[in-house]
Amino acid sequence: MHLQYYAISIVSLVSLIDCHKLAFNFNLEINGSDAHSTVDVFLDDYQIITFDGKDIRPTIPFMIGDEIFLPFYKNVFSEFFSMFKRVSTSTPYEEDLTYYYECNYTNNKSTFDQFYLYNGEEYTDKTQEVTNKNMWLTTSEFRLQKWFDDEDCIMHLRSLVRKMEDSKRNTG
């Protein structure tokens, strides 16, 4: 009985240790003639990096001084938004476009999720009409996958988790 209880406990702990998520939240705000882009990167629901359209900054101590991920992500995010140069800013109303992409690694299985928001509401409708909303929906995934695909996400997730755990061991 006790052996069975310990076996279940160990399996549960391994499952918790083996569950991680890396998420990217791309945002493009259009207000009249002004457009502003941002990206927030999360590891296990903790923001680790922020990009303001020009500069990238670590938001958690273990990412300070990073020479691998920060330059790479700055390049990816800059390229991602540079492809939206033709975005229409002549609309008289505000547009808030969000593309959310995440990869999860749980119980030795990779899963991926993504969704799109327009002014805070999820949308999936593709039409032939050329609008910022349709352009964002039809090209965001392609633009990210050009530089960073699902397999890359899992590799980065594992590396960032290792970096986080090493930092905890070295400071704790």
Label for each model-derived stretch:
Residues 2-172:
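Extracellular/lumenal regions of secretory-pathway proteins
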